[in-house]
Amino acid sequence: MTGYKTYEYVWLDGYKPESSMRSKVKATDADTPPDWSFDGSSTQQAEGGSSDCLLIPVQTYSNPHGHDIVMTQVQSADHTTHPSNYRAEAEALVTDEWWFGFEQEFFLTDPETG
């Protein structure tokens, strides 16, 4: 597959009360990750009869150890914001002056004293 790139699309599913991260990989000859669809019934984001959902790329991160990572937001098949798309809701609330991100905390302890 010379000339192909692999992208790992990452999104939040529709499970309640807490969403989980989902991902799937696409091989394509596109220089940038294209929009992609998925079956939302398996992620609690659609009913079985009309289960198409769209993954819209928001940000791509190069990964020297494998697939480029594509952070996405979920839209319904008609390109409207999906109810599980919290990013769109947050984006509507803030201006360019705000920063939104994740924080991870670490605690260092002395193994002798605990």
Model region roles, listed by residue range:
Residues M1-G114:
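ATP/Mg2+-dependent ligation/transfer catalytic cores
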